């Protein structure tokens, strides 16, 4: 379907070469200041034509808010946003071979099988142009999360092809065992990431190696994949649902819905499978003396006296999630992107009707590697997941706070989303 989320619902629309793309966002809290200026920076980070190693398609991707705000303030009603497709070239796809042959590893064939008809230009609905609506909606979610809780979301390119920022070694099979990676998790900012354009890998040497590799594949009319790592800091504890809607499951759902994704791992991930439990377990320690980040100190939660979690963990192999529920530590995960399917090299493939084979040389304008522009898309989907989980937790505890206190419990104040909570105690304790 084209809708994501339960409480913060985002519906995207549009195809690669239609007149516009965009979204409708339902569930935005009323009373938040919001203009296009809050959304445009992320749109600009996502847009094509950023450098010599991205698609040359010339789109400004200027977002227009159509509804849901008045005088720059959210009304609590659905917010509609659109971006015009200004540099459409459907004629690039109307040549004889691309009408006859489905592109290898693209969605041409599968969309035709599903719908019985498909867009003849670009990837249609499967195009990365669809993610414009996601990024616009994610910017709204992110603003609320930062104002309310001081949440910070930062993604960066962690590998391109065989070039890694933190290559696996015998000592560090997972980056989560590497002190340098954990230092990066706690300190990386978007400003730092964007100072390493065009690749967005926050290390000068690795960034150069990755750029050279992408350039090599571009010059050969080929493509190469890679990974994007994302960090979410200052997340309230208690987010996520048991069983089927665990927080990491919802993050995986969100990330694997992004075009060209092929893999997802959270925390220590697959490398953590090689680490013994005696090392992998994250011991709890008191968070009493933990330094409060400036964004948290300035948040609505701090102003309203909502306490920070009482505990934190000494290590963070779990990636900030245990039992499917956030524990307050930084959440980090990695998303794998395949090489872009559309390449300029000639490829032998079958016709749509399967009666013969021929040679397809795809036309159009495409990224030799999608990972540099995937960074803000990953951030946006992360924001949508956390926003939805926050609203679910707020709804649950608001409903609970209106009930009379249970006789066998003692109220211990407020939880990390700002509602009264109770601690279970023995009846003998109540008599003392």
Swiss-Prot record:
Belongs to the chorismate synthase family. Residues 406-432 are annotated as: Disordered. This is Chorismate synthase aro-2. It catalyses: 5-O-(1-carboxyvinyl)-3-phosphoshikimate = chorismate + phosphate; FMNH2 + NADP(+) = FMN + NADPH + 2 H(+). The keyword NAD does not apply. The keyword Flavoprotein applies. One of its GO terms (molecular function) is chorismate synthase activity. InterPro entries: Chorismate_synth, Chorismate_synth_AroC_sf, Chorismate_synthase_CS. Pfam families: Chorismate_synt (PF01264). The active site is at 17, 106, 367. Pathway: Metabolic intermediate biosynthesis; chorismate biosynthesis; chorismate from D-erythrose 4-phosphate and phosphoenolpyruvate: step 7/7. GO terms for cellular component: cytosol. Changing residue 367 to A/N: Does not affect substrate binding but stringly reduces the chorismate synthase activity. Bifunctional chorismate synthase and flavin reductase that catalyzes the conversion of 5-enolpyruvylshikimate 3-phosphate (EPSP) to form chorismate, which is the last common intermediate in the synthesis of the three aromatic amino acids phenylalanine, tyrosine and tryptophan. Acts also as a flavin reductase (FR) able to generate reduced flavin mononucleotide in the presence of NADPH. Keywords: Amino-acid biosynthesis, Aromatic amino acid biosynthesis, Flavoprotein, FMN, Lyase, Multifunctional enzyme, NADP, Oxidoreductase, Stress response. The lineage of its organism: Eukaryota, Fungi, Dikarya, Ascomycota, Pezizomycotina. NADPH binds in or near the substrate (5-enolpyruvylshikimate 3-phosphate) binding site, suggesting that NADPH binding to bifunctional chorismate synthases is embedded in the general protein structure and a special NADPH binding domain is not required to generate the intrinsic oxidoreductase activity. CDD domains: Chorismate_synthase. Optimum pH is 7.0-8.0. GO terms for biological process: amino acid biosynthetic process; aromatic amino acid family biosynthetic process; chorismate biosynthetic process. Residues 408-432 have a biased composition (Polar residues). Its EC number is 1.5.1.38, 4.2.3.5. HAMAP family: Chorismate_synth (MF_00300). Homotetramer.
């Amino acid at each position: 379907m084209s809708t994501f989320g339960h409480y913060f619902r985002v519906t995207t629309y549009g195809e690669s070469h239609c007149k516009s793309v965009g979204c409708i966002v339902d569930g935005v809290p009323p009373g938040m200041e919001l203009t296009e200026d809050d959304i445009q920076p992320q749109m600009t980070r996502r847009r094509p034509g950023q450098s010599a190693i991205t698609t040359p398609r010339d789109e400004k991707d200027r977002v227009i808010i159509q509804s849901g705000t008045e005088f720059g303030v959210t009304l609590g009603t659905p917010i509609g946003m659109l971006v015009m497709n200004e540099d459409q070239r459907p004629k690039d796809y109307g040549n004889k071979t691309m009408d006859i042959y489905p592109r290898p590893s693209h969605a041409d064939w599968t969309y035709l099988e599903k719908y019985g008809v498909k867009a003849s230009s670009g990837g249609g609905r499967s195009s990365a142009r669809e993610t414009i609506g996601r990024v616009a909606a994610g910017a709204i979610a992110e603003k609320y999360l930062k104002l309310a809780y001081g949440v910070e979301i930062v993604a960066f390119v962690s590998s391109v092809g065989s070039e890694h920022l933190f290559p696996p070694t015998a000592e560090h099979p997972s980056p989560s065992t590497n002190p340098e990676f954990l230092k990066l998790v706690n300190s990386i900012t978007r400003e730092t990431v964007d100072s390493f354009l065009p690749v967005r890998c926050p290390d000068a040497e690795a960034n150069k190696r990755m750029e050279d590799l992408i350039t090599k594949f571009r010059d050969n009319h080929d493509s190469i994949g890679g990974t994007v790592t994302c960090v979410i800091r200052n997340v309230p504890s208690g987010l996520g649902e048991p069983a089927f809607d665990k927080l990491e499951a919802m993050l995986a759902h969100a990330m694997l819905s992004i075009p060209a994704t092929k893999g997802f791992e959270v925390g220590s991930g697959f490398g953590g499978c090689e680490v013994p439990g005696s090392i992998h377990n994250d011991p709890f320690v008191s968070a009493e003396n933990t330094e409060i980040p400036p964004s948290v100190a300035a948040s609505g939660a701090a102003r309203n006296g909502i306490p920070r979690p009482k505990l934190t963990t000494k290590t963070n192999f779990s990636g900030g999630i245990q039992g499917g529920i956030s524990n307050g530590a930084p959440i980090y995960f990695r998303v794998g992107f395949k090489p872009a399917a559309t390449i300029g090299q000639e490829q032998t493939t079958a016709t749509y009707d399967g009666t013969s084979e021929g040679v397809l040389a795809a036309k159009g304008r495409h990224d030799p590697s999608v990972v540099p522009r995937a960074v803000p898309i990953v951030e946006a989907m992360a924001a949508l997941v956390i926003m939805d989980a926050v609203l679910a937790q707020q709804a649950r505890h608001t409903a609970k706070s209106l009930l009379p206190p249970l006789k066998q419990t003692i109220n211990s104040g407020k939880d990390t989303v700002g509602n009264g909570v109770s601690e279970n105690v023995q009846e003998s304790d109540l008599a003392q």
